[in-house]
Amino acid sequence: MSDSGFKVHSMELGPMENFVYLIEDIASHRCAVVDPAWEVGQIVARANQHNLDITDILLTHSHNDHINGIEDLLNHAHAEVHLLKPEYEFWAHELDKPSLHHGGDELTLGETTIKILHTPGHTPGSACYQLGNEIITGDTLFVFGCGRCDMSGGNPEHMFETLKDMKQRLPQDMLIHPGHNYSVKETCTLADQLEGNPFMHYEDAETFVNYRMHVHDRTRNEPYDAISKQQLKIANLL
């Protein structure tokens, strides 16, 4: 939630611990749903509870667990679907006139400005949505983790560059809203990530790729807790 002209409402839905987000523009009561999936009835009920008009759907990427409620939601709301052009091309799915974007584009939701970041790695056209001092990161960045890169469209080298860019460009007090509830807490700041996300500790692509592709999933279990740089060094993983 924010003290600005918007609020971010989170809902954990489905068997894969997905977070679905409702971005509320306070002045206009317009609402954008990020990654509608699983229980569309609950999403609509939450919007109605806050007297919100769902006018937009934002996709962080095209994996089924993040998009399987689009058609159902469009039956309930006259909404415009937004995603990055490279993700639409990777997805190869027919949508009725979606709005295709590029990294750096901005959306306007009432009086709220939403900046779209192109963050490839989990998929070629993965996107994060930045509004004020908060960012919705999909499966790019989790609390103390990052998205897999071994699925179709995944690329660990691209993920390394994406996280490196986020470390350099985003303010440390920015609040992270991830795509799944995989960790010991639902959200955190970028400063928390820099301190405790093992993927943020790597300075070169080769060691990052080795950890992401061959080590991480064998050595960590959910819920993810913080791992310091020193802990990685002691374990000879850095």
Describe the function of each predicted region.
Residues 89-93, 144-151:
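A short acidic, helix-capping loop that chelates divalent metal ions and anchors anionic groups
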Residues 33-34, 55-63, 82-85, 118-121, ...:
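Active-site neighborhood of phospho(di)ester-bond hydrolases with catalytic His/Asp-centered motifs
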Residues 131, 136-142, 146-147, 156, ...:
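Internal catalytic or translocation cores that form aromatic/hydrophobic pockets or channels
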Residues 17, 28-31, 38-115, 195-203:
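Active-site HxH/HxHxD metal-binding segment of metal-dependent hydrolases
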Residues 2-3, 161-175, 179-238:
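Accessory terminal helices/loops
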